[in-house]
Amino acid sequence: MTTLTITRPDDWHVHLRDGEVLADTVRDISRYNGRALIMPNTVPPVTTSEMALAYRDRIQAHNQTEQFSPLMSLYLTDNTTADEVRKAKASGAVVAAKLYPAGATTNSDSGVTDVKKIYPVLQAMQEVGMLLLVHGEVTTHDVDIFDREKTFLDNVLAPIVQDFPDLKIVLEHITTSDAVVFVKNANENVAATITAHHLLYNRNHMLVGGIKPHFYCLPILKRNTHQLALISAATSGNKKFFLGTDSAPHAKGAKESACGCAGSYTAHAAVELYAEVFEQAGKLENLEAFASHNGPDFYGLPRNQDTITLVKDAWPVPASMPFGGDIVVPIRAGENMEWKVK
């Protein structure tokens, strides 16, 4: 197959950052996506509906397309209230709230210290139909970084699913076979996003032959057996799994340093990267469901009505891309992509 036409895709998990870099991140995310769910871990974090609407306006100021629409999310803290959830839902622009365990990832220091503290908030979310997005890692120092996801599933997420059976939950950027099994076995209100980089790479790519800082992300890349489980889930056609890039830009100097930031930038070629994975798995026919159908179906939103076309046509990814007054090194920098969006 050299040409593939699919319903216009959406990205259900992306970081655009804020300020002058929006000119670059919005350009990339809006190129062919219909919608993108914008993560709220900016500085300061987006903790109220007013902040979410103001952030949306800043994003829209750089949107040069007609088809793209940003969807907003709230950042949950120990101090989030049920009233704030109801207010956010009523705004019409905020579709989800994000649970970051405190310290789990970039700009998550304001996150939730104990999930029991936000049980009244989760109850309100269940009542009004607001989705819960979860960064599924524990942050206690006695848990190995490669085991954080599994421990979170057992100790934190399983009780939430049991206590709030009608709450729609998205386990974001899953990285383990354990997460795949958890989502498959959970009730119909539990789904997951999978990133392109966790499908394409494993920890060997990051660590063998020298440390590759641009592969460093959180949750961290796991061993290849987990990678294979993710590929199987993503390409299976199972409606519980859908596209969320977790594209997370950092300036080159912040990545290539003695204490580098976590995050990989993939928004420049997201659906093209996924197409390679699906082609290698012999499942290109399932790309449309993963990229364009399963996400809006789970969120209770209409599918996009128009299409995009991918063609098998190699093109070079630049060594770096503009990022405000700095540069970002994208995934596949200096290499060729196999698929291109016409």
Curated annotation (Swiss-Prot):
Record-listed Zn(2+) 2 binding positions: K98, H135, H173
Membership in a protein family: Belongs to the metallo-dependent hydrolases superfamily. DHOase family. Class II DHOase subfamily.
Role according to the record: Catalyzes the reversible cyclization of carbamoyl aspartate to dihydroorotate.
Gene that specifies this protein: pyrC
Residues annotated as catalytic: D246
Organism: Vibrio vulnificus (strain CMCP6)
Reactions that this protein is recorded to catalyse: (S)-dihydroorotate + H2O = N-carbamoyl-L-aspartate + H(+)
NCBIfam families: pyrC_dimer
Main enzyme class: hydrolase
Name the UniProt record assigns to this protein: Dihydroorotase
